[in-house]
Structures are given as C-alpha cells and as structure tokens.
Amino acid sequence: GEEVYIPDGVAHFLEHKMFDMENGDAADEFAKLGASSNAFTSSSRTAYLFSTTTNENDCVELLLDFVQSLNITDESVEKEKGIICQEIKMYDDDPDWRVYFGAIANLYHKHPVKIDIAGTCETVNNTYKDMLELCYQTFYHPHNMMLFVVGNINPEELIGVIKENQNKKHFLSENAIQRLKIEEPTSVAVKEQIDTMQVEMNKLIVSIKINEILDDPQDKIKRELALNLLFDLCFSKSSSLYNEWLEKGYINETFSASFTQERDYAFILMGGDQDDYELLQKTIFNFIDHVQDLEIAEDD
C-alpha cells in the first residue's frame, strides 16, 4: 500500500539497461545466432523483440533469459544517462515527433500519457539504480508478461523449450500492482498550439480525445475494427476520397489517420504535412462534421 515516487522515463531507462548481460550485450548475442533484435517503450508497455530465419528456439530462450535478469551497477546507470539525454534532445529537435507527441499531450490534463516516454534530462539524471531495481522487481514478473511468437515453427517443441527454461528459474511472489484511478476531465487541456521550427513544410495534426473508455474487451475490439475500417475505406491509397483530396491539393502522401486505444485512454489522430495548414485543418474538421453522411463507393 506504500506509494513510491518514480521519475518520469524510468520504463524507457530500464529498457535501455535490460540488454546488459553478465557476459556481454543481448543484441550481440542475438547477432551471433543470426537474429536482429530491438525494443521499444510506449505509454502502456515495453516490448522486446527479435527477427530471425534460424535458431528460433535458441533465440526465444535468449529473449526469456535477458528479459528475466537485470544486470546493472551504479556506474552503468550513470553512463546511460548521457546516452538517453542525447536521445531526448534528438527527439526534441524532430518536428515530426514534436507535432505527434504534442497532439497527444495537449488532449490530457492529468493522464500520464501526456508525459514524454523518455522523461526529461532532469528526470533521467534523478534516476538511480535502486529505482530501476524496484521497477524491475515490480513489473518484470511472468504474470505481467506476454510472449508472442509468429513464424514457421513447431508449437509443441517450442512450448517444451519455454517450459523447460522457466522451470529452471525461481521467481519471487507476484507483487500486486495497484493502478490508481486517474480523474481525467472530459475537456482537452490545450485547444490549439503552434510551434515554430525550421521545416520544409508545415505539419499539422488534429487530435480527438475519446472519453468513453470501454471495459469489455469485445467492445474494444469492435470499436477498434470499426474505426480502422473507416480510415482504410476513406484514406487508403486507392480510396476515392483520399485521391480526391490529393488531386485538390488538400493533402499529400504524408496524410494519415489513426486510432489508439489502451486500458484507460483513447484518441484519434489525423494530419500530415501541408504548407497551408489552415486548409488541411478545415478539411479535417469538415470530414469530422459530415462523416456520418459519408457515402463509400463499392470499389473502395
């Protein structure tokens, strides 16, 4: 029941350090097996992945082993801070990231999705070994993990490999994770924001905050499928509406529309590059106002 303060960006920091193994780097070990590896942290999860055409079972074991073992020192944590701060500064100078993340952050008053995943250089510099260990022990437990494998594999053989791997390990009792309910207002935090940067073409994203949070997984799937289908019908490269907007100069090939839905937040993003960003904004608003009256051609 104890509340613990953790600096912003800890999940991303931990992702960086998870590749440190006792005898080297996990990415190098994957390369020795003929595989490429990567990882990413979003507002809701951290994922570790590999891609390979050979040694599939060995790669799965390596994935399990390095994710289920934390090898950090005070020195290695301090060294990583400079690397992460450079990454943060790189994203701060990236106009595509600035408009994308700004469009999301401006929707929310309190929800942590408005906080940059990497944190700030200040929060990174206030992150220490004991904090990373606490987060690892709390969240990196098999009960809070999912393994997803796709490929030309023998499922029964691979499941046997996984069970044997896990049976060799001792895991601490699962920590009950209590997620505090966030009282997020229904209004958006910032209606409009214009930043000035050196860009070849202006960038605009219209974001829509969805306040109805669905609890039923089936309802969530239905809503996600419905909106993704709508966007595919309207804005795929072969759709009549997309090509009409393209021909009239309302949009260019950078235009996109997407729907994101997580446990306790959901939003829509629509936008792209356009010198006349007010024209693009007007086009998107008009689409939103009349989407219920939209007629979809059969060949779309």
Q: Where are the regions a protein language model picked out?
A:
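Short pre-active-site segment immediately N-terminal to the catalytic Zn-binding motif
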Residues: 1-8
